[in-house]
Amino acid sequence: MALITLRQLLDHAAERLQGYGVPAFNINNMEQGLAILAAARACDAPVIASRGARSYAGDIMLRHIVEALAEMYPQIPICLHQDHGNNEATCLSAIRHGFTSVMMDGSLQADMKTVASYDYNVDITRRVTDAAHWVGASVEGELGVLGSLEKGEAEAEDGSGAEGKLDHSQMLTDPDQAVEFVQATRVDALAIAMGTSHGAYKFSRKPDGEILAMRVIEEIHARLPATHLVMHGSSSVAARLQDLINAHGADMPQTYGVPVEEIERGIRHGVRKVNIDTDCRMALTGQFRKVAMESPKEFDARKFMIPAMKEMEALVRDRFERFGTAGNASKITVIPMDDMAKRYASGALDPAVATAKAA
């Protein structure tokens, strides 16, 4: 099956009777890709394969990995997505190398450390959207700065993360401004800032509404019911994986992630894409450490990789099933990017805004 755009995939997710979410898993190497696609085939789920660490595996390598996966698993629609693009050149380079979707993160300036103004965000995101839509590619934007409401700080990940102290006005997406932003930029999906952050150390306690503001998602969905919302930094950081890692030589402090139940709540209110990376890293690392400690004479990297891939496959399948993604791959007929470009040009995919009902 051909690669699919993010817009078509998330439209399909929103059009189902109950709606479903699609986890976006970072792919940095072959083993992660094989684990994700094995899980997808087992439960008939479409896939968003996201490139996060650009310096680790560049556009060309990842494109060929995903092309190979698409050939091996022709029954699975795969969206090849670039995460946290820092400027137009990064986004357009990804599209030129075969990515069907890009994220323009204009919440930060090009250094990915300095908080950007709203006008800067609108301007650069709109420019990327205009260019991407000409060729049928999808664009995700971000409004508000990802980070911990507890600490007032962002967690740097793969070179991306605001520096310095932040206040809640910066770290919570304003629902009214979200409407303006979507109308001005015509993004296909909108990443929301509501207390999640990158990395493992998201919360010092089980999150509640004070530090994980799910109400923001609900308020934005009420105003933008047709806009696909995105939760970043949504690994659950399961205690089981923390314990597995620490039982085999690590010293990982206790931490809390985003409960899967809260993600399911978000899906009921318009969240269609859910970014998950730390959970996959932990699944892999736990098994690496287990093999290293239990078989100290082992030197064959494959003996480390195989159980690690199985652990990650189980985690990925669980998310496909919990988010309602399972069972939908075979229901999707991919629309070519040229046809998506025509739909953008016609205005058929312009954003819709909820109108207030008369009293």
From Swiss-Prot:
Record's cofactor remark: Binds 2 Zn(2+) ions per subunit. One is catalytic and the other provides a structural contribution.
Record: residues binding D-glyceraldehyde 3-phosphate: 50
Misc remark: This protein is encoded within the form I ribulose-bisphosphate carboxylase operon, which predominates when carbon dioxide is limiting.
Family to which this protein belongs: Belongs to the class II fructose-bisphosphate aldolase family.
Protein keywords: Calvin cycle, Glycolysis, Lyase, Metal-binding, Zinc
Recorded GO MF terms: fructose-bisphosphate aldolase activity; zinc ion binding
A biological process from GO: glycolytic process
Name of this chain's protein: Fructose-bisphosphate aldolase 1
Keyword Metal-binding: yes
Catalytic activities: beta-D-fructose 1,6-bisphosphate = D-glyceraldehyde 3-phosphate + dihydroxyacetone phosphate
Active site feature: 83
Cofactor(s) demanded: Zn(2+)
Lineage: Bacteria, Pseudomonadati, Pseudomonadota, Alphaproteobacteria, Rhodobacterales
Binding locations of dihydroxyacetone phosphate: 199, 233-235, 275-278
Main function: Catalyzes the aldol condensation of dihydroxyacetone phosphate (DHAP or glycerone-phosphate) with glyceraldehyde 3-phosphate (G3P) to form fructose 1,6-bisphosphate (FBP) in gluconeogenesis and the reverse reaction in glycolysis.
